[in-house]
Amino acid sequence: MDKLRIKGGKSLAGSVDISGAKNAALPELCAALLTAETVTLQNVPGLQDVATMLKLIRNMGVEAERSAHAPGTVILNAGPLSSPEAPYELVKTMRASVLALGPLLARFGEATVSLPGGCAIGSRPVDQHIKGLQAMGADIIVEHGYMLARLPKGQTRLKGAAITTDMVTVTGTENFLMAATLAEGETILENAAQEPEIGDLAEMLIKMGAKIEGHGSRRIRIQGVERLHGCTHQVVADRIETGTFLCAVAAAGGDVVLNHGRADHLEVVIEKLREAGATVTAGEGFIRIQASGRMKAQSFRTTEYPGFPTDMQAQFMALNAIAQGTSTVTETIFENRFMHVNEMVRLGAKIQIEGKVCVINGVEQLSGATVMATDLRASASLVIAGLVASGETFVERIYHLDRGYDQMEAKLRGIGADIERMKA
């Protein structure tokens, strides 16, 4: 098992190429299941979750190859698909596997998808996926840890429906969006998620021949078509990777350009960084951040897009930990999203948890120690903390990091960080 060694105290300078978004690439790989024609995806990040999704759809019989000539390009053909099943062995490490449910049901009329590992119906919105697809005419039962979905006897297509979810669900919106493209009639999604990755998925589906309006709003309208065709599509840049590097530079100090970064997808985070004291400028296909000295602590509350993203909460907390002043961070999206706090405290941070709120008293200096990553974004926050801590910091269990960041330590090293991957 690998770990990272970080020697803190170096400012950052240069440029970083932002990779394609994991949270767009995963549903877009599943969207290839909707057609028998070839789909080419460009700017696909080299992540563990992407590798798992490729393994999952290959297991179904999909031909999926990374191009030898074009890095980041994946060529997919679901024509020879033989088994509309997502087994537990391949699903247990990745919740996004539920995204195969809608496309399989829409194109093949059946799907058997394992419940994601550790997922209790009700605590995560898997029940919303089931309700929505049932509204479109699917018969779905949950037994032995699997969702078994079928079209009723004599029915060859899902039926368009009005679907209103009980809460905003990103993967639910994506599942219904994909399923509705091949449904009979019109589907209207109310209370839809507005994340840029959903807009990117919709743009890909439109290239495939889907009829979609309203993506990027709370109400999406889809007119079903009989078949979709292949397409070539470039995965949108990863706004969370972008935000992570912005926080790293704000914390460590420096002057860095993030190529392919989309400021319009990170407006709330960028505004907070400016209020903290960083200079952030942006243009077509880049964001530049300049920072020096201690930032000013910023309070925030996570909400659905376009609010402050829960996936940026831990990274910004690392910045607040060494900022001037006291801040509060309120987490409204997920439970158990403060698992990084105890590890940051080991580095010298002064943070108290009060229910869904963290109170952070900024300190002048963190000190290096051995810490353990507990999840994807927590691991990124510990890397940021390590960049500013005195002495050496070792971050263990970085397989979490590899799930969502494409060569993070190499990119940081390229802008001046003293960081290396080691065998634990």
From Swiss-Prot:
SUPFAM superfamilies for this protein: EPT/RTPC-like
UniProtKB keywords: Cell cycle, Cell division, Cell shape, Cell wall biogenesis/degradation, Cytoplasm, Peptidoglycan synthesis, Pyruvate, Transferase
GO biological process, alphabetically ordered: cell division; cell wall organization; peptidoglycan biosynthetic process; regulation of cell shape; UDP-N-acetylgalactosamine biosynthetic process
Location relative to the cell: Cytoplasm
Enzyme Commission no: 2.5.1.7
Catalytic activity, reaction form: phosphoenolpyruvate + UDP-N-acetyl-alpha-D-glucosamine = UDP-N-acetyl-3-O-(1-carboxyvinyl)-alpha-D-glucosamine + phosphate
List of residues that carry 2-(S-cysteinyl)pyruvic acid O-phosphothioketal: C119
Name of the top EC class for this enzyme: transferase
Ligand binding (UDP-N-acetyl-alpha-D-glucosamine): R95, R124, P125, V126, D127, Q128, D311, I333
Active site: C119
GO molecular function, one term: UDP-N-acetylglucosamine 1-carboxyvinyltransferase activity
Protein's pathway: Cell wall biogenesis; peptidoglycan biosynthesis
Protein role: Cell wall formation. Adds enolpyruvyl to UDP-N-acetylglucosamine.
Family statement: Belongs to the EPSP synthase family. MurA subfamily.
Record protein name field: UDP-N-acetylglucosamine 1-carboxyvinyltransferase
Organism for this UniProt entry: Polaromonas naphthalenivorans (strain CJ2)
The organism's taxonomic lineage, starting at the top: Bacteria, Pseudomonadati, Pseudomonadota, Betaproteobacteria, Burkholderiales
Gene (name only): murA
